[in-house]
Amino acid sequence: MKPSVVRRSDARPRPDLHAVSDAIVLRDVRRAYDGRDVVCGVSLEIRAGEIFGLLGPNAAGKTTLLSIISTRIRPTEGDAWVHGKHVVHDVNAARRLLNVAPQEEALYPTLTAEENLAFFAELYGVRRSERARRVQEALDTVGLASRKGDRVATYSGGMRRRLNLGCALVSAPRVVLLDEPTVAVDPQSRAHIFDAVRKLRAGGTTIVYTTHYLEEAEDLCDRIAIMDEGRVVACGTLAELLPLARATEVIRLRLLHPPDTLAPLEAAEGVEKVEAVGNEIRLFTTRAQLALPRVYRTIAQLGQTVLQTRVTPVTLDDVFLELTGKELRD
């Protein structure tokens, strides 16, 4: 891979030949604001027709990366292509291939859902003869067909988020970028959004889905890139990422008092790693059944009392902790 350089505006770099069939290709993408990098040399290949998750805490660089892919901002360095179209040098061609459902809603509350969708269909250049069909398809996809004649001012927050997604669909994009689509929505609307995303994937649409909810990434995404401080620290399927935690199970203990030392627990047979926050202890292991009796004996020798014990499979939060030294939920 060649290092990224700042190119002249008339240069037209191309992705590697093997990557042209991918929906999105990023090569050494960097974005800086006021001399500070918020996206730091990201390289990714996102396959056509997959749900690709960008998982990370707030300020990880997810939204900025999405803005580069969508052509809303230019990278400081590096290159990005959407189905072979460069997001800087072929910007209009790239824009025709994708659409974005941003966190910020751009809806007209005095119009009905149907009228909002029709407006965006016209804005995106959908032929008049196709608009009614596109509007109805979007309503069906996001589960709002029965409320299409109601003014948006009467919608709940979750329904508005679903309509916001629908507005991105009327142009029939090959790539849809979803930026934290379920933040502060009700469970019913979240389920509708999940259904819509799965329908789009079934129809061959590529989805890039940013979230800081690890459960969403685990349940919904085909592959996941974990981001922290502008960098991709790991990328793969859930099955590929979970082993990075160096364990298969986590013993979660709540003690009566915070421990004075973790060294005896770290030395217990079967324990790979120990993390503590206050009186909450997490012990990473591949053999919880073997490790637990030894852990209990060690805790008793320390004069501690166990108030609660849970054994759970490792999660992406545990992977994030292993890779970055902090919790995704922090």
Where are these regions (language model features)?
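Helix-to-loop junction immediately C-terminal to a conserved catalytic motif
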Residues: 70
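Conserved ABC transporter NBD signature motif
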Residues: 78-89, 93-94
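Conserved ABC ATPase "signature" region
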Residues: 99, 118, 122, 129-147
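Catalytic Walker B motif of ABC-type/P-loop ATPase nucleotide-binding domains
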Residues: 176-179
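ABC transporter nucleotide-binding domain
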Residues: 194-286
